[in-house]
Amino acid sequence: MEILFRENLARIARFKTPHGEIETPTVMPVINPNLNFLDESTLRSYGVQAVITNSYIIKRNQRLNEDALRHGLHSLIKFSGPIMTDSGTFQSHVYGDIEYSNKEIVDFQKAIGSDIITILDVFTEPDESYNSARSKVIETYKRLKEIDFEDKIIAGPVQGSIYPDLRRLSAYLMSDALYLPIGGVVPLLESYRYSDLVKIIFNSKVSSDFSRPVHLFGGGHPMFFAFAVMLGVDLFDSASYIKYAKDNRLLYSEGTRALNDIREFPEWSPIHGKYTPQELLHEESEKRTRMLALHNLKSIFIEINEIKERIYENTLYNYVEEKARSHPALFKAFMSMINYDTSDYSPLSYKSPFFYYDKTSLNHPIIKRIMKFTENYISNSRHTLIISSKYWRPGVKNENVIKNIVECTDFNLLVSWNGIYIPLFLEDSYPVQQLVSSGLNDKKLEEDYLKRLKSINNDIEFYEGEHYDKRLRDYDTEKINTIAMFQFNINERFFDKSNIIKSKSTGHIRNIIEDNNIIATMRNDGYLTLSIKGAYRLLSMKPWPGLRVVVDDESGRFNANGYNVFFKFIKSFDTGIIPGNETLVVSEDDDLYAVGKAAVSGIEMYYYKSGVAVKVHEGVNKKAA
């Protein structure tokens, strides 16, 4: 996978197959080889890049078998792009053992020219016993290992029922395959057990090779797409577009509606303006099914396109939070999802403002990171003062009062922010000021959070309007040092005798200069971009391997001249790197080559083999162009 854009575990990425590239996230419509009434041009016009069909059905039908072997799968299906084949696992699960072995069905898929070939895995039911599920996980892995991959894309399904540790084990083992479907989930999807799916997807994703495409088998209803993508799913397959059409049902992004229950078709529907619902109900069955299938396909790809746009905008989390209120099962899934800490994968900041709805918004991974820092910030046992909204709110403050408190005390200073307390000096940093808030704070949560902070430092009180006389420190210097502490995870002062240059129009900090050299500039999101001088300073302060990406000498020579770092040249790295944060590019001897922004988290660095890992903004020899 080559990553293009990302938000936490969600990504827009692409990978190559023998019949072309696939950009994810996307959906593969299921094509019945016996009955394919949508031609390739129609499928392409709706956004279809790849399709999936069942090799078991083809193999056991003499006519289809002979045709596929003689002319190839793409001729049989009449689709020139990538085609994935399933192995018959679900048929085996529903109807009992099938007549072909794992190796036979895989060899058949190879022979007919499938682009993505699926092994015959062993299906695990949601109500399966732990021991039974574990034995099926091991058996599925054994089946993967008996296959000769050659140069093919082999899909190794992740099984394990609803047991998190088995899903983790299976994902780790099956990462030997180049493509990772998450299997055994159709019964959960059909019964709206989305909270169980959240558990399955998260545990499968974080234990897998991040360079592998992750596919949710059978996850073809658009109402759950955004949740699955947020948790790291790249692809879906959908028979629902035709299955629901045959049953006179229509797919929408928030659920399903019966044809006889709707008054009119939405304007985006390909049926709009051609039929009324009542007219279509009386249409001949085959034509009605085709029209409803086109509506359903359109609904699926509208949702996929919306999700991709949300990833690009960095608003997918907001979208999931919005969609959670569209169905009780989705809300339960969202409440399950926020229990998982994905802050390791979360970028330093987002393109779009932070949306605060209510206390559930505080489970956003970026807020969890700030809350963790707040606890560390006050752990020095200093007197801690909380400044109320009377004196400080995002973007609005009593300048004289705040400056007096800051410069004439050495206290830890916190402000009230959406029901929690955070360091005052992060006031301009994302998302403290880059915020759209409902103002619906939870007083009980605020009280509980204060108790938690007092368990760390009991010397906490609220500011009551006192005036302080003796100047002890500089406001701006304290601010940039606190930002550096948070951004670089350091416990000592990064700046000391600095000359701080501010914007004449806004008064915001722009450059930090020492000895006539720019050490850092303040980004629009309130965080620091380091110059090469600043990078040398960070290198001296952070013990190995902190915030480092180690590259070979060949890459290092290019990086020193301002060129980006590519994944394939990385030799080692700090797993604590945050996407979008400053990253030091060094040699194996810890000599600095460059500084830039990490494209992915440190946890992901190991897995990707193509694309840009660090976008360099300055090398030791030259700035980036």
Curated annotation (Swiss-Prot):
GO cellular component: cytoplasm
Name this protein carries in UniProt: tRNA-guanine(15) transglycosylase
One Pfam family, short name: PUA
Pathway per the UniProt entry: tRNA modification; archaeosine-tRNA biosynthesis
Residue numbers binding substrate: 121, 184
Names of the cofactor(s): Zn(2+)
GO biological process, one term: tRNA wobble guanine modification
KW Transferase (keyword) present: yes
Family statement: Belongs to the archaeosine tRNA-ribosyltransferase family.
Source organism superkingdom: Archaea
One MF annotation (Gene Ontology) recorded for this entry: pentosyltransferase activity
SMART domains from the UniProt entry: PUA
Cofactor comment: Binds 1 zinc ion per subunit.
Domain PUA: 546-621
Active site residues according to the UniProt entry: 86
Reaction(s) catalysed by this chain's protein: guanosine(15) in tRNA + 7-cyano-7-deazaguanine = 7-cyano-7-carbaguanosine(15) in tRNA + guanine
Keywords: Glycosyltransferase, Metal-binding, Transferase, tRNA processing, Zinc
Main enzyme class: transferase
EC number annotated for this UniProt entry: 2.4.2.48
Role, per record: Exchanges the guanine residue with 7-cyano-7-deazaguanine (preQ0) at position 15 in the dihydrouridine loop (D-loop) of archaeal tRNAs.
